[in-house]
C-alpha cells in the first residue's frame, strides 16, 4: 500500500512569510535555486545518505534520473546539480502556494502517486491547509518549557521532565547508574502514553492537560522501581528518520525554532517525474489498528515525531532549541534542559554532552551496560 499524506512544508513557508516576512517571497528561494541549478559540493553526511539510499531506491521510478549518474550517487566533494528541483522552486517562487498545490506540479504529484497505487488526489493537495497551533507548556524547576502539541510528540518531553522533577538529579550525578535508570524508566512511561493517545486532535480527544499535570507526573513517578526495570508495552512507532533543524534570532528579538523532515532517510522513494524531489514518508506513522487514535483516515494528519521547542524564564526568552532523530527527540529535549538547569552546563556543554537513548522493547535483556559506553 502506498500511503502518502499531503506534503505540508510549502504551505507552512507561505504562512510564515505572510505573517513575519519582510522580503519578497520570490527572493527567499533564489539562493536555493542557484545551488540546485549551478550545483554545490556534496557534504560527507549527504554522500552517506545518498549511498545508503541507492540500494533501496534505485529501482523506484525517477530516482536514478535525479540522484544517480553512471549507476552511482554523488560522493563527498562531488558537485551535484538538480535542475528539475530548480525549475520546481522557480514555479513556487513565482506563484506562491498555488504553484505547488494547484496547477501542473500538483497534477504531476497526484497522477504519479495514483499510478503507484496510492490514494492522494489533486483535491487533497488543493485543499491542504497548515495550521497555527498553541504550544503546550509545563514548568520545570522555574523554567517554562514550550513544545508542539499532538499530532507531534512534544508532550513526551514535558512528561519526562515532570516525572523527573520528583527526584534530585543533581545529587545523583550526570550519567550515574541511578540517573540513567530513572531517565529510562521515565521515558518508558511517557512513551506508553504516546503510543496510546498521540494523534490528530481534530479526530481524537487527547487528554493533554492530564498528561502534563504535576499530579499525574507524581502518579507515574511512583511507578518507578529504583532497583528494577519495569515492563512497559513498547510504543510500536518506528524510530528511523532523517530531519534537519535550525534556530535563528534577529535584532528585533524574534526567534524561530524550525524543523523539517522527509522521514526514513531521504523519504518515501516516491519521486514525481520532472520535479526533482522525493515525497516525505510521514504517512508511515499512521496506525492500521481499528479504533486506535492514530488509525489512518482520510483528511487526517499522522502522528509526527518532529518537535521544535523554546524555553522561557519569568516570561523572557531563555533558549530556542531542537534536535534531530525521530523518537530520540523528546528524550534529547529533556536531557538538554536537565543538563542546563540541574547540572549547570552552559548551552554548548548541554548540547555536546553524551545522551541516553532508549529504543525498542522495554523487556530487560539482563545484560549489563558496558562501562565504556557511558
Give the ranges of each region predicted by the language model.
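M16/insulysin-pitrilysin zinc metalloprotease superfamily fold
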Residues: 154-170, 311-319, 326-351
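Noncatalytic scaffold domains of N-terminal-nucleophile
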Residues: 4-96, 100-102, 106-152, 212-213, ...
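Glycine-rich phosphate/pyrophosphate-binding beta-alpha loops
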Residues: 146-154, 244-247, 259-270, 323-330
Amino acid at each position: 500500500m502506498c500511503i502518502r499524506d499531503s506534503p505540508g512544508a510549502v504551505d507552512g513557508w507561505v504562512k510564515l512569510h505572510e505573517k513575519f516576512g519582510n522580503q519578497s517571497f520570490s527572493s527567499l528561494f533564489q539562493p536555493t535555486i542557484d545551488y540546485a541549478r549551478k550545483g554545490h559540493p556534496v557534504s560527507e553526511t549527504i554522500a552517506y545518505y545518498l549511498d545508503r539510499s541507492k540500494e533501496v531506491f534505485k529501482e523506484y521510478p525517477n530516482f536514478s534520473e535525479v540522484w544517480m549518474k553512471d549507476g552511482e550517487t554523488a560522493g563527498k566533494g562531488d558537485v551535484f546539480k538538480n535542475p528539475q528541483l530548480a525549475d520546481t522552486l522557480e514555479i513556487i517562487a513565482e506563484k506562491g502556494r498555488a504553484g505547488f498545490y494547484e496547477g501542473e506540479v500538483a497534477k504531476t504529484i497526484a497522477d504519479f502517486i495514483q499510478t503507484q497505487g496510492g490514494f492522494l488526489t489533486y483535491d487533497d493537495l488543493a485543499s491542504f491547509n497548515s495550521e497555527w497551533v498553541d504550544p503546550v507548556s509545563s514548568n520545570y524547576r522555574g523554567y517554562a518549557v514550550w513544545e508542539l502539541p499532538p499530532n507531534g510528540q512534544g508532550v513526551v518531553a514535558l512528561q519526562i521532565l515532570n516525572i523527573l522533577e520528583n527526584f534530585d538529579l543533581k545529587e545523583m550525578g550526570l550519567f550515574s547508574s541511578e540517573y540513567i535508570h530513572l531517565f529510562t524508566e521515565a521515558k518508558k512511561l511517557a512513551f506508553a502514553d504516546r503510543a496510546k493517545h498521540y494523534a490528530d486532535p481534530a479526530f481524537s480527544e487527547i487528554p493533554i492537560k492530564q498528561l502534563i499535570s504535576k499530579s499525574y507526573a507524581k502518579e507515574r513517578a511512583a511507578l518507578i522501581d529504583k532497583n528494577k526495570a519495569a515492563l512497559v508495552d513498547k510504543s510500536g512507532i518506528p524510530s528511523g528518520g532523517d530531519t534537519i533543524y535550525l534556530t535563528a534570532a534577529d535584532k528585533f528579538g524574534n526567534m524561530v525554532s524550525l524543523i523539517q523532515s522527509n522521514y526514513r532517510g531521504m523519504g518515501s522513494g516516491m519521486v514525481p517525474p520532472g520535479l526533482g524531489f522525493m515525497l516525505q514518508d510521514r504517512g508511515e506513522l499512521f496506525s492500521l489498528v481499528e479504533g486506535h487514535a492514530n488509525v489512518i483516515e482520510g483528511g487526517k494528519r499522522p502522528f509526527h515525531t518532529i518537535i521544535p521547542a523554546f524555553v522561557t524564564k519569568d516570561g523572557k526568552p531563555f533558549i530556542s532549541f531542537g534536535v534531530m532523530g525521530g523518537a530520540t527527540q523528546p528524550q534529547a529535549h529533556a536531557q538538554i534542559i536537565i543538563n542546563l538547569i540541574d547540572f549547570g552546563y552552559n548551552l554548548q556543554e548541554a548540547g555536546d554532552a553524551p545522551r541516553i537513548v532508549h529504543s525498542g522493547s522495554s523487556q530487560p535483556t539482563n545484560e549489563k551496560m558496558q562501562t565504556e559506553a557511558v
